[in-house]
């Protein structure tokens, strides 16, 4: 077996990838989303095709043409701008290097928009080859993911920490008694994996340490109860429902997910907040969580299950819909079926108001949000999104009118760190500014959707919280306004909902 040693820079990238499990990986963190050149062996996923725009690049020469590495740290997933032909010699590629999280195919790194750098005569072919879509659809990806689930010990900051010697704005200083709160998080990989070979056995990951390191006091820890019937779409741009659940299936999934949340709380020594008084003391209690559910699919049309989740599982934050049109209403990413919030959905909103559960309308259509706003007696939240002037069809972004509908209840809209919306934390901070210009600072919050994205977001660890706060100050927000958006506003809604 031959090993590529012709390029020091290429070799350093391969070395860093191989040492992935031994943080800190400063070299790779600095390279995330940047253009790199790397040399390796092209491994087509279908050796019979003359050219491919999706393949693996390995550091070492494979033993045979059909040998696909099972170690995700020995290769990089490649998406070419133009299909290229394989060969018996290594190739040099230039593209954008990305770290992946829980990738459906199990890979840890991807080279995007890649182009071949010619080292000898020859030119890329334009014949179509096997695409990633075809590979994922073939089912081969599932077997690979079973061997090597995508999992990171931690993410790191893509934004450099503020330098005291720079002329950057003063760092944010939390006032006594202030709380930082993430309105929407799947921290610790709390949700059951969509990979059936992992399922509920998906390893839990650290939560307390990154929260302490970044100064995050409270997270709304959200289970998800539609994962067994949803999947990543073929174009990898969204999740979609692919089958109807069996009776009782999503309720049973919720029991598994609530149990995982309980296990994570115990393992990480987290404090579960269930009351306004409990939230008030959260700053002195160490890392805290508010138990949440993303999608009320587990109710399966049975209102009494709201009470059960409240009493047995300490549920205090309920998002009505997620990635399937359920009994409560319509979602942004599918064609409308109900015309907005259903009558059952309205009953759930009223029951949450009575019990003391925050109602979250994220993922819901404008019509769902509008009716929920007319029904509720407590402030609503829309926990994770961003503002768009004219959202595309099936977009998760919202219009100004949708944001105002939430704000008019006294509620809060959480700005999320999607890399499809914002290219860095500075851009995300300006997303906060645009939202605040529409609804007012008092109605804007933070919803990281931690570990909930298909592609790595611009906020990937709670250790980045000081950097986000600095970006908000640089965007023109005051210390007090920053404190409001990073927790104070959600605190107001939580206290109002539970009293």
Regions found by a protein language model. Give the residues of each.
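Sec/Tat-exported extracytoplasmic proteins
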Residues: 46, 101, 265, 356, ...
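Short acidic/polar capping segments at secondary-structure boundaries
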Residues: 97-98, 116-117, 294-297, 322-325, ...
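N-terminal hydrophobic targeting/anchoring segments and the immediately downstream early-domain regions
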Residues: 126-142, 148-337, 392-446, 450-499
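Active-site core of metal-dependent hydrolases
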Residues: 321-401, 414-421
């Amino acid at each position: 077996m031959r090993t590529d040693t012709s390029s020091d820079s290429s070799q350093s990238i391969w070395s860093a990838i191989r040492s992935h499990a031994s943080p800190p990986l400063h070299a790779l963190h600095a390279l995330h989303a940047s253009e790199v050149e790397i040399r390796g062996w092209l491994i087509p996923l279908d050796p019979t095709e003359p050219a491919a725009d999706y393949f693996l690049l390995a550091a070492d020469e494979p033993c045979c043409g059909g040998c696909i590495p099972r170690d995700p740290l020995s290769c990089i997933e490649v998406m070419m701008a133009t299909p290229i032909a394989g060969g018996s010699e290594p190739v040099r590629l230039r593209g954008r290097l990305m770290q992946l999280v829980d990738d459906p195919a199990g890979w840890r790194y991807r080279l995007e928009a890649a182009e071949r750098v010619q080292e000898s005569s020859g030119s890329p072919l334009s014949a179509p080859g096997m695409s990633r879509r075809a590979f994922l659809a073939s089912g081969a990806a599932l077997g690979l993911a079973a061997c090597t689930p995508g999992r990171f010990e931690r993410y790191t900051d893509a934004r450099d920490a503020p330098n005291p010697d720079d002329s950057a704005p003063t760092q944010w200083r939390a006032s006594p008694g202030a709380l930082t709160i993430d309105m929407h998080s799947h921290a610790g990989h709390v949700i059951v994996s969509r990979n059936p070979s992992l399922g509920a056995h998906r390893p839990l990951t650290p939560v307390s340490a990154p929260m302490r390191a970044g100064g995050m006091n409270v997270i709304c820890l959200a289970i998800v109860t539609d994962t067994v019937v949803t999947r990543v779409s073929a174009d990898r741009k969204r999740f979609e429902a692919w089958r109807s659940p069996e009776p009782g299936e999503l309720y049973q999934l919720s029991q598994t997910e609530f149990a995982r949340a309980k296990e994570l709380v115990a393992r990480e020594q987290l404090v579960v907040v269930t009351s306004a008084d409990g939230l008030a003391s959260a700053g002195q209690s160490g890392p805290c969580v508010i138990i949440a559910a993303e999608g009320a699919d587990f109710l399966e049309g049975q209102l009494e299950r709201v009470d059960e989740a409240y009493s047995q599982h300490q549920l205090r934050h309920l998002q009505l819909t997620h990635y399937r049109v359920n009994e409560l209403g319509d979602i942004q990413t599918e064609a409308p079926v109900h015309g907005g919030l259903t009558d059952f959905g309205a009953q759930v909103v009223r029951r949450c108001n009575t019990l003391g559960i925050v109602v979250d309308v994220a993922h819901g259509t404008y019509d769902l949000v509008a009716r929920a706003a007319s029904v509720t007696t407590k402030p609503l939240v829309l926990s994770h999104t961003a503002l768009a002037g004219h959202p595309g069809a099936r977009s998760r972004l919202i219009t100004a009118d949708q944001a105002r509908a939430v704000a008019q209840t006294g509620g809060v809209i959480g700005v999320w760190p999607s890399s499809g919306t914002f290219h860095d934390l500075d851009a995300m901070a300006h997303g906060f500014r645009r939202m605040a210009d529409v609804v007012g600072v008092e109605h804007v919050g933070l919803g990281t959707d931690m570990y909930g994205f298909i592609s790595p977001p611009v906020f990937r660890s709670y250790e980045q919280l000081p950097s986000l706060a600095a970006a908000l100050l640089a965007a023109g927000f005051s210390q007090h306004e920053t404190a409001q958006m990073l927790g104070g506003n959600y605190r107001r809604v939580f206290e109002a909902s539970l009293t």
